Amino acid sequence: MWPVLWAAARTYAPYITFPVAFVVGAVGYQLEWFIRGTPEHPVEEQSIQEKREERTLQETMGKDVTQVISLKEKLEFTPKAVLNRNRQEKS
């Protein structure tokens, strides 16, 4: 009798183990939530985007936004193009 049961269990193992694993997983999941309880999230007054906007506003409050670096000054620090290496500089 045992060899017949073992042969049947071996043949139908995928059909037996999946429902058993599903039930064990579902019971464990529910049991874990029952033991832990609902998680308490801290209530935030502002969202992350609002905090970021507030921080950028505070940073720009002390600056004069009309004073910007000209494009000519920015271009001085960029490397010269490869094709302009052999050309003479204009004075």
From Swiss-Prot:
Q: Where in the cell is it found?
A: Membrane
What is the top-level taxon of the source organism? Eukaryota
Q: Does the keyword Membrane apply?
A: yes
Membrane topology reported for the UniProt record: Single-pass membrane protein
Keyword tags: Membrane, Transmembrane, Transmembrane helix
Keyword Transmembrane part of the UniProt annotation: yes
The residues that cross the membrane are: 12-34
Spell out the GO cellular component terms annotated for this protein, sorted alphabetically and separated by semicolons: membrane
InterPro entries according to UniProt: UPF0767
Family indicated by similarity: Belongs to the SMIM12 family.
Q: What is this protein identified as? A: Small integral membrane protein 12-A
Q: Which gene encodes it?
A: smim12-a
